[in-house]
Design a protein with these regions (language model features):
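Cleavable N-terminal targeting peptides that direct proteins into the secretory/outer-membrane pathway or into
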Residues: 1-26
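Periplasm-facing N-terminal accessory domains of Gram-negative outer-membrane beta-barrel systems
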Residues: 22-104
Length: 104
């Protein structure tokens, strides 16, 4: 009986630790602007390459995106502008990418 209890407790601890690891996330934030005019690009798309994760910028060109911890490639795009890809190491709670400038 004691042996079964030990196995059950070990299993429960592993499940809890696995769940905590699975939900480890970083929040990426930044601003997408026109490279020449420095105007914010409203509704620019920010996507994680190879996934359905993404967001669009707000009226000030700002975005926030939650991703799993690790390396990701972000793709920034806007109609009439050249697409820009950027590798990001997403580790920790908040990662500020600063200003992303797109060329038309």
């Amino acid at each position: 009986m004691k042996n079964q209890l030990k196995h059950f407790l070990l299993f429960a601890v592993l499940v809890v630790l696995g769940t905590v690891t699975a939900v480890a996330q970083a929040t990426l934030k930044g601003k997408v602007m026109d490279a020449e005019t420095h105007e914010p690009l409203i509704g620019a798309t920010v996507m994680v390459k190879g996934s359905a994760e993404g967001t669009v910028t707000d009226t000030d060109g700002n975005f926030t995106l939650k991703v799993k911890d690790g390396k990701v490639m972000l793709v920034f795009s806007y109609v009439g502008y050249n697409e820009l890809s950027r590798n990001v190491k997403a580790v920790g709670r908040n990662v500020d990418l600063g200003t992303i400038a797109l060329n038309s």
